[in-house]
């Protein structure tokens, strides 16, 4: 080996080995301090990619487990509401069994029916208000999808159903006793279209209202007219030159119950034109029926002319004892009356109708006549109560306000209907119970999978402390030895000086 001064190859070799041992020491210390074998992609590129995929799966499965727990909570909340609905149905069934006993009086049946109605209303309330995190669980048919896996399509569905008195088939449940209406039971009541003759203001009334003017003779009169929802009194007969300006039209009020016409405290003069003279007042001014209502009237046997001229009236009934009973609204077509609904706020009129199949096979919708429509079974609605006229064949069915018991159409086989409702609730509760068990199973499986994936990831990226401690010790020794050897290597060029002595 040549003796040189400029290049100390032994020193360079030693420095290189010292750098390697220092790098190894740094790596060992990094792994020991972080606990990870792979701290960056340079440590193990393939291992880092695999471990990262495991991390994504582990995080996704952990969240899926939380989702499944939320699914259990939803199902549990819904099942709890169904349990309360079931309790109400059990009570309704108990009441239905009680009502079937012939020892009950009509007042007993009315009380039983009142509680049944309240129980059904509570079922509707529970159905409409039960929710989980803003989602109403029984108000409508719905399918909730719960993500229970780390990948697309790994879901469990919760099928929710609308549960209320209507979907249970109990919205018209009635256990009140039904009576047959025989010919001798029919009460021939009278109808009133709600009109009253107007009581026009007298000369004395007019004088008092308009300041006691001078009038010659008995000439002071007032004729009443109507336009756009207002009544007017056309005053005439002022003969004194100073008072003739008081002749003209004034807004007045009309008492619909008595027909009395009166001026206001401060009479208001009007220039209205086109008003129509009236001699009677009605609770509701006549309102013309719309096209659909006219068609229903015609299908009920009303002539086209009478249907076009049909107007709305307020009904009242006088029973056999002379008692006057306020009824609902009706459409007057010709000399007959037909049950109707009237919205006082909007003025909308709708005839109460019955759909039936005519002899020619066509389906028609006829207005319900207060007395029968086209020979079909009809009903009369008075003050919200329905009266069945089917048993009064061959007779003019009028109002029977005294026989409300006869009006109620008793539900046939009520216990069978309630049992069907209970079965419907039980079926949904069973589904919810089963899906809760599914979620529990999914959570257990997710936990096992997360554990196994975590172990697999650990074997790839976690530090083996036994190995890394050994590596650190080796690197430390090499560092110390390398430093010592480097000092010796740096002394080698000194040997060349001996040749110069």
From Swiss-Prot:
Keywords: Bacterial flagellum, Secreted. Belongs to the bacterial flagellin family. It comes from Salmonella abortus-equi. Individual Salmonella serotypes usually alternate between the production of 2 antigenic forms of flagella, termed phase 1 and phase 2, each specified by separate structural genes. Flagellin is the subunit protein which polymerizes to form the filaments of bacterial flagella. One of its GO terms (cellular component) is bacterial-type flagellum. It is found in: Secreted; Bacterial flagellum. This is Phase 2 flagellin. InterPro entries: Flagellin (IPR001492), Flagellin_C (IPR046358), Flagellin_C_sub2 (IPR042187), Flagellin_D3 (IPR014981), Flagellin_N (IPR001029), FLIC_barrel (IPR049365). Signal peptide: none annotated. GO terms for molecular function: structural molecule activity.
């Amino acid at each position: 080996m040549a003796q040189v001064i400029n290049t100390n190859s032994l020193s360079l070799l030693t420095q290189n080995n010292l750098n390697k041992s220092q790098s190894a020491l740094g790596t060992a210390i990094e792994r020991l301090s972080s606990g990870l074998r792979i701290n960056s992609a340079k440590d193990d590129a393939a291992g880092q990619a695999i471990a990262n995929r495991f991390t994504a799966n582990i995080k996704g499965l952990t969240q899926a487990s939380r989702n499944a727990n939320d699914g259990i909570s939803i199902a549990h909340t819904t099942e709890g509401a169904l349990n309360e609905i079931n309790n109400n149905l059990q009570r309704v069934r108990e009441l239905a069994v009680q009502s079937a006993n012939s020892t009950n009086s009509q007042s007993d049946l009315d009380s039983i029916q009142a509680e049944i109605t309240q129980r059904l209303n509570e079922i509707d309330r529970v159905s409409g208000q039960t929710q989980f995190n803003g989602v109403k669980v029984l108000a409508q048919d719905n399918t909730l999808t719960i993500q229970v896996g780390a990948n697309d399509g790994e879901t469990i569905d919760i099928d929710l159903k609308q549960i209320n008195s209507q979907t249970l088939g109990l919205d018209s449940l009635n256990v009140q006793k039904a009576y047959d209406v025989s010919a001798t039971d029919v009460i021939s009541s009278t109808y009133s279209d709600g009109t009253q003759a107007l009581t026009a203001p007298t000369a004395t009334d007019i004088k008092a209202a308009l300041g006691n003017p001078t009038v010659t003779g008995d000439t002071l009169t007032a004729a009443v007219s109507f336009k756009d929802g207002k009544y007017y009194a056309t005053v005439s007969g002022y003969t004194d030159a100073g008072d003739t300006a008081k002749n003209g039209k004034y807004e007045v009020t009309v008492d619909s119950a008595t027909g009395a016409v009166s001026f206001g405290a401060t009479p208001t003069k009007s220039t209205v034109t086109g008003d129509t003279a009236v001699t009677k007042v009605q609770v509701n001014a006549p309102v013309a029926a719309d096209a659909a209502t006219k068609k229903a009237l015609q299908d009920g046997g009303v002539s086209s002319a009478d249907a076009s001229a049909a107007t709305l009236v307020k009904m009242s009934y006088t029973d056999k004892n002379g008692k006057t009973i306020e009824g609902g609204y009706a459409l007057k077509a010709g000399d007959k009356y037909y049950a109707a609904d009237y919205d006082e706020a909007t003025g909308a009129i709708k005839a109460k109708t019955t759909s039936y199949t005519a002899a020619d096979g066509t389906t028609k919708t006829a207005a319900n006549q207060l007395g029968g429509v086209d020979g079909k079974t009809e009903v009369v609605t008075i003050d919200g109560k329905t009266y069945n006229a089917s048993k009064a064949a061959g007779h003019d069915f009028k109002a029977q306000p005294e026989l409300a018991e006869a009006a109620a159409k008793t539900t046939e086989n009520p216990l069978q209907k309630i049992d069907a409702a209970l079965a419907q609730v039980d079926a949904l509760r069973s589904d919810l119970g089963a899906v809760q068990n599914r979620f529990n199973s999914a959570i257990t499986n997710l936990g096992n999978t997360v554990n196994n994936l975590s172990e697999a990831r650990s074997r790839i990226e976690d530090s083996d402390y036994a190995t890394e401690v050994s590596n650190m010790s080796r690197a430390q020794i090499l560092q110390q030895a390398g430093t010592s050897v480097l000092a010796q290597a740096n002394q080698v060029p000194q040997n060349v000086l001996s040749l110069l002595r």
